[in-house]
Amino acid sequence: MTNRTQPPADPYQDVPTTVVFDEFSETATTLTGLYNSRSKGAATAEEREEWWDKVMALRDARRAVPAHDRDQLIAHIARWARVIEELESSERG
């Protein structure tokens, strides 16, 4: 009997690496947009700088991951998706 409450160890097991890379890129783009929006809407210069630093760190992380390294791509997708969820849920209040 299969336990359906646990996600598969690799949700991308039957997905080509090129598609995983596309998901990686789209997730990074979504998170960059959220960070950029918060930077533009910041109440202070310090807060704006903090969000902009996150934009730059994300850019650097995105550039550092080789397009063929599935493990790193998937790890970043998962990490960034959690951050996106946290930011979006904080918007909803």
Language-model features and meaning:
Residues 4-42:
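N-terminal acidic leader/helix
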Residues 45-56, 71-78:
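Short, charged, amphipathic alpha-helical segments
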Residues 36-37, 47-51, 59, 63-66:
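Soluble, non-transmembrane alpha-helical interaction regions
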Residues 57-75, 87-88:
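Amphipathic alpha-helical coiled-coil segments
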Residues 21-24, 70, 77, 84:
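Long amphipathic alpha-helices with heptad-repeat character
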Residues 27-28, 35, 51-52, 58, ...:
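Amphipathic coiled-coil alpha-helices
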Residues 2-14, 75-93:
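Short, charged, intrinsically disordered terminal tails
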